[in-house]
Design a protein with these regions (language model features):
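DNA-recognition element of transcription regulators
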Residues: 64
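Short, Lys/Arg-enriched, Trp-marked, Pro/Gly-tolerant hinge/linker segments that flank
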Residues: 107, 127-139, 145-199
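Short acidic, gly/pro-rich beta-turn/loop elements at beta-sheet edges
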Residues: 27, 48, 83, 93-94, ...
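Generic protein-terminus/edge-of-domain signal
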Residues: 1-61, 69, 75, 102-103, ...
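Short, locally clustered residues in the helix-turn-helix/winged-helix DNA-binding domain
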Residues: 42, 85, 120, 172, ...
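Double-stranded beta-helix
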Residues: 89-107
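Phosphate-binding site recognition
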Residues: 110
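Ligand-binding loop in jelly-roll beta-barrel domains
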Residues: 67-92
Length: 199
């Protein structure tokens, strides 16, 4: 079944993308952001706590943290990972996270890795400079961060957007849009952000 129709067009906007070598300092509590985080674990192990559950992250896995989700990070040794931070929006609708089943964690394929590497090649100057979420996840210019660094041709822009959509699609379970319902108390805040972004 189709996810989208003429009333719902999915839009994804990349904010940050890069490769990070996390150590024992990768322990941050009470993190909540207006954007989502996608990870591909390369080496090592760590953990993320969200939705009252512990997710153990290990090499070769894809993992996603939806926007407006309280979570915590924990790393006892090291974890090297690729990441993409992005906004999602259903134009004419709501956040896709509120309207479909999401698989948060699963094994990555070789194609997933190739797509991630190509995406970072296309967006090579958009890495997070300071890994502490307090320094970047709620800054005033969050909706335009790194946009001045993304200066590629139309064909590469389409390729970049297509790769992000492909990777994001891997997390979707039930491909039929569910009846709108709030997953957390920040849905109203998310709508405000979407309104500001569109006006």
């Amino acid at each position: 079944m189709k996810i989208l129709n003429n009333k719902n067009t999915l839009s994804l906007q990349m904010l940050y993308a890069g490769y990070h070598t996390a150590g024992k300092e990768w322990c941050y509590n009470n993190v909540i952001s207006p954007f989502s985080r996608m990870y591909l674990i390369d080496k090592g192990e760590a953990a993320v706590y969200m939705n009252k559950k512990k997710y153990n992250l290990s090499a070769g896995e894809l993992f996603i943290i939806p926007k407006f989700t309280f979570h915590m990070y924990e790393c006892d040794n090291f974890m090297y990972h690729y990441y993409i931070c992005f906004f999602d929006q259903l134009i004419g609708g709501q956040s896709l996270f509120d309207n479909t089943e999401i698989h948060y964690q699963f094994p990555a394929t070789e194609m997933d890795r190739m797509l991630m590497l190509r995406f970072l090649e296309l967006n090579s100057d958009c890495a997070i400079q300071d890994p502490d979420p307090k320094t970047y996840d709620n800054i005033p210019d969050i909706y335009t961060v790194n946009q001045n660094k993304v200066n590629y041709s139309l064909n590469k822009e389409i390729e970049s957007n297509g790769i992000l959509l492909q990777l994001f699609s891997r997390f979707l379970g039930n491909t039929q849009l569910l009846e709108s319902q709030s997953r957390n108390q920040y849905e109203r805040l998310a709508k405000i952000f979407m309104y500001i972004d569109n006006n």
